[in-house]
Amino acid sequence: LTQRSNPRSVRICFGEIIMDEDWRESTIKKEALDYHEAEPKGKIKVVPTKPHSTAHELSLAYSPGVAYPCLEIAEKPDDAYRYTSKGNLVAVISNGTAVLGLGNIGALASKPVMEGKGLLLKTFADIDVFDIQVDTEDPEEFIKTVCNIAPTFGGINLEDIKAPECFEIERRIAEATDIPVMHDDQHGTAIISGAALLNAAELQGKELSNIKVVVAGAGASAIACANHYVSLGVKMSNIVMCDSKGIMTKNRLDDGDLNEFKAPFAVDSEDGSLADALVAADVFLGLSRGGLVTGEMVAKMADKPIIFALANPTPEIMPHEVTAVRSDAIIATGRSDYPNQVNNVLGFPYIFRGALDVRARDITQGMKMAATKALAALAKEPV
């Protein structure tokens, strides 16, 4: 039953009133633009942390007093953690080549996302942030820039950098610096979706070693999630990954159509579409673009399916589209305005908090696995 009126339309489905998506999106758009435009512009700012109201305090903060910590650090670089904000300062850095589900929109256009990460790091983990947009698509220039400014920071959060360049960028920056470096699109997504998978599989009575997982998308987050799922117990042979051309098969690998990062996920099957892959699938992991999945495709999945439609800002399929065809599905999205949010904010603030607190030089696979299991356990705690 559908009831329509201006300026909104309402769909009544399964006893719930669901706002028309066009109306919902137009409302959110206006509210979001007003939110960002309100004074002061943007979402983050720098504030002093020491007294500075007298001439004497200013002489300690700057000349002549500032010379003394400079000399101490010159003699013993590790004292930067003692006399500066380095130990609680993270750089959120992007070149804007893979922003949310918006694609390559450029470095400057990525700034609202980086400011948003800064707000979340400060709010949830009390970590200070400089957001930095590097205006280059050249991996060598990007790596050099980040490595040159790395001494300022206690950690580096790489963000919204397209694949496959992101893999080499993260690896080389991590090797060249002595502070924790994490590409959140890869590892943050893997950690939080891995935790969700553990709990969803338990709720649906499925063993990880037996489930068929279909991944829509073959970029940074998709490849990292698939690798992490294997570490959790999913069989590599049970993962079917689809890129923009369809199922990643050994035929396509033989034709030179898959790069070195996609190659391990080439399956020995006929070429096909995402719809073909989803037949009898237990899990759908969407890390691609909005509107990619239909109710008809979901209807052909296995009993008690698990659907993680994590494309942002628009999921691959809306929750009400799933419930219209399945009463036995677990559905999650990356959005905070729908139930069952699976979003990186559940992970990256606390991962960096822990890494900074122990002065970790790297964010290791063991740390990622521990975070995954801790999140899964936390979700079971009473609210």
Please place each PLM-identified region on the residue numbering.
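N-terminal ligand-binding/catalytic initiation module
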Residues: 20-181
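Active-site nucleophile and cofactor-binding loops and adjacent substrate-binding regions
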Residues: 135, 182-191, 214-218, 336-338
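Adenosine-phosphate binding glycine-rich loop
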Residues: 184-185, 204, 309-383
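Rossmann-like adenosine-cofactor binding region
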Residues: 262-330, 335-337
